[in-house]
């Protein structure tokens, strides 16, 4: 393998949406950094079987709905 081409791999703390914390190794941030999750396996509809909840981050969802909310895509 070539030297000095791979990102640093170190321990970080991951905080899930319910406050549960665990440590894992990652290339994210620096040693000891904290990664706060917005969506995790306990809340994601693909894993829970629930309906999808859309979070409006920075008004993007509102802007999309204002531009394309009146389209029907074949629904009558």
Curated annotation (Swiss-Prot):
Task: Output one GO BP term.
Answer: translation
GO terms, molecular function: rRNA binding; structural constituent of ribosome
What Pfam family does this protein match (any one)? Ribosomal_L31
GO CC annotation terms, alphabetical: ribonucleoprotein complex; ribosome
SUPFAM superfamilies under this entry? Answer: L28p-like
Where do transmembrane segments lie in this chain? Answer: none
Which keywords belong to this entry? Ribonucleoprotein, Ribosomal protein, RNA-binding, rRNA-binding
Matching InterPro entries, A to Z? Answer: Ribosomal_bL28/bL31-like_sf, Ribosomal_bL31, Ribosomal_bL31_A, Ribosomal_bL31_sf
Lineage, top-rank taxon, reads Bacteria
Q: What does this protein do?
A: Binds the 23S rRNA.
Under the subunit heading, UniProt states: Part of the 50S ribosomal subunit.
Q: Which family does it belong to?
A: Belongs to the bacterial ribosomal protein bL31 family. Type A subfamily.
Matches recorded under NCBIfam families: L31, PRK00528.1
The protein's name: Large ribosomal subunit protein bL31
From what organism does this protein derive? Beijerinckia indica subsp. indica (strain ATCC 9039 / DSM 1715 / NCIMB 8712)
Q: What is the lineage of its organism?
A: Bacteria, Pseudomonadati, Pseudomonadota, Alphaproteobacteria, Hyphomicrobiales
